[in-house]
A protein has these predicted regions:
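Helical segment within the ABC ATPase nucleotide-binding domain
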Residues: 69-83
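Catalytic Walker B motif of ABC-type/P-loop ATPase nucleotide-binding domains
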Residues: 55-58
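Conserved signature/switch motifs of ABC ATPase nucleotide-binding domains
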Residues: 29-32, 50
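Conserved beta-strand-loop-alpha-helix hinge in the C-terminal portion
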Residues: 109-142
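Conserved ABC ATPase "signature" region
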Residues: 7-26, 78
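Hydrophobic anchor residue at the start of the ABC signature
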Residues: 44
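Conserved small/polar residues in nucleotide/adenosyl-binding loops
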Residues: 163-165
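Conserved H-loop
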Residues: 85-90
Length: 165
């Protein structure tokens, strides 16, 4: 509707994207009848049907259970590979950021600012490998611990400065 396309073409694109996100046959199901993971996939398909150059995902997987989250992470990587779209993912999950990002930016709090940037190989590895294996990769574990320690130390510094006020 937004682009005033032919309704038949639009319906075909809807079916294609629902199939890609694993929801073939759910096109006429009301959203409220879908599980949380299915609703997230509908939201992703709804975004992608408009063929944006950039996809902004703000905490898209935070409310999902562990299994559904892992499936959605694989789906995001698959869509990234197949479409070549730029995806900006905002998340509080260090592990998720490491798995899905080519670049990771750690923000420092109060005031919010860029603290450190990382270039990562794990998303590319995830295109061909098992995400669970990547999570156990020694480089992945090391990077996760480095970032978590950095964040922990920043939080401690803030708490100490608040105590001394």
């Amino acid at each position: 509707r937004m682009k005033k396309e032919d309704p038949i073409k639009t319906a075909k694109k809807v079916e294609e994207w629902l199939d890609i996100v694993g929801l073939k046959g759910f096109g006429s199901t009301p959203t409220y009848q879908l599980s949380g993971g299915m609703q997230q996939r509908v939201a992703l398909a709804r975004c992608l049907i408009n063929d944006p150059e950039l996809i902004l995902m703000d905490e898209p997987l935070g409310a999902l259970d562990a299994l559904t989250r892992e499936k959605m992470q694989s789906l995001v990587l698959k869509i990234w590979k197949e479409t070549g779209k730029t995806i900006i993912l905002i998340t509080h999950s260090v592990e998720e950021a490491l798995l899905l990002g080519e670049r990771l930016y750690v923000m420092a709090p109060r005031p919010g600012r860029l603290h450190k940037e990382y270039t990562l190989p794990f998303a590319t590895m995830g295109l061909t490998g098992d995400l669970r294996e990547i999570k156990n990769n020694k480089d992945f574990v090391s990077k996760r611990e480095e970032i978590l320690s950095m964040i922990w130390n920043m939080e401690e510094e803030i708490m100490l400065s608040l105590i001394h006020i």
